[in-house]
């Protein structure tokens, strides 16, 4: 049975390290190695541009049944990379954590799509995307950066992470959809 384990790497080098680890570790030792990302929008020169950012900066997720072998290959690398462990034992992601990440993404495309929400007075109501039905995970929202901050458990630790959330008034939503239809 394959299980997801977390590999800690240097923050900002997730993609480079994923490629190096995939070259270093034999294909039979890992089913999949990825770093989950989220889709969001940033404003560049007055225009909204789609971009992706790491969901858990500094962490990769490895689908393996043999974390010890993966760790042995990581120790041979010049760069910092290690399978997370506690008291000398490798700690897999809990079933709930795997279901949450697996529910937001799918194999081959580990990017959490952007959610949409409507601002109704002081309330923000998620109307579309992976956050629909998971509103309880949202701790804060930064409308200017089109992100929602979620608090969840990862390997027994409370972690705050970001996902894309476009919060629009009803009028802005109509205008944005119209612009996308024209483009």
What is the meaning of each model-derived region?
Residues 129-131, 141-146:
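Short, conserved beta-turn/loop elements at beta-strand boundaries and strand-helix junctions
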């Amino acid at each position: 049975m394959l299980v997801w384990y977390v590999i800690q790497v240097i923050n900002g080098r997730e993609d480079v390290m994923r490629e190096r680890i995939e070259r270093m570790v034999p294909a039979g030792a890992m089913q999949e190695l990825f770093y989950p990302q989220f889709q969001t929008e940033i404003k560049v020169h007055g225009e909204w541009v789609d971009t992706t950012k790491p969901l858990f900066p500094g962490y990769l997720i490895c689908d393996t049944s043999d974390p010890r072998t993966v760790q042995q290959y990581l120790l041979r690398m010049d760069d910092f990379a290690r399978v997370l462990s506690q008291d000398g034992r490798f700690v897999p992601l809990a079933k709930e954590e795997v279901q949450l990440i697996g529910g937001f993404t799918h194999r081959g495309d580990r990017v959490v799509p952007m959610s949409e929400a409507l601002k109704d007075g002081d309330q923000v109501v998620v109307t579309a995307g992976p956050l629909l039905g998971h509103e309880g995970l949202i701790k804060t929202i930064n409308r200017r950066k089109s992100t929602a901050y979620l608090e969840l458990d990862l390997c027994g630790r409370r972690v705050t992470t970001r996902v894309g959330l476009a919060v629009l008034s009803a009028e802005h939503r109509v205008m944005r959809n119209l612009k996308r239809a024209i483009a």
